[in-house]
Amino acid sequence: MNYFREMHKVKLFIEKLADYHHPDVFNPWADYDPDYDVASARSIRRKQLARYLIHRIENARILLIAEACGYQGGRFTGIAMTCERMILNEHPYVNSQMVLGCQGKRTSRRDSPFIPRETQRTRGFNEPTDTVVWNAALSAGLGPNDFLLWNIFPFHPHKEDHALSKRTPTESELQDGLFFTEELLKLTGPLPVYAIGRKSEQTLTGAGYQVTGLRHPANGGATLFREGLRDSLIQTGLYNG
């Protein structure tokens, strides 16, 4: 791999991401909220996504695509299905070396009076779904660079006037997000795609992609997600658990 050429492509991709704006949507690589973000948040999140992608665009064996960026995960790290505690070495299964190959940085403010929980302020945000996905992939024998995590809508959709909330992306937003997934696939080349949740699966299949649908881990779906991923990897010969 020509590192500098590939990094240039990655940075161009991130610039495209940063150009996206939509009402009630937070763009981790372009937007800044002084109530929650440190001053250099946008730059940190861009650099962390670039590091994450450069380790995987030629090494990933599968692509796992969920629905949208969550406020406890990628909203603050810039990386899909990856929370701050993972890149701060505050997580029981995942550490910064596995995600980035180096020490990560938080972008949430330790001193923010708007972040409600003390553990979130002192240790960073934690997202249960992120833990399930990472743990399932690692337990199946995949290395950290063997799977690339993404969201069909890569930004954080939130309720009006409620920054730390979540909502389902609209159909229009999902179609907007599909463009960025297709741009990502130009970087990686063809990969087996696993769609996490119905919105991701329907958007991808509607665009003509062949995907393996997996139950979303949220709302009691963690076991079905783990079993579905394991069984599919066994069938394709990628399981090494």
Where are the predicted features?
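Short, flexible loop segments at boundaries between secondary-structure elements
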Residues: 208-240
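A polyanion-binding, active-site-adjacent surface
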Residues: 2-192, 202-207
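Alpha-helix/helix-capping structural signal
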Residues: 198-199
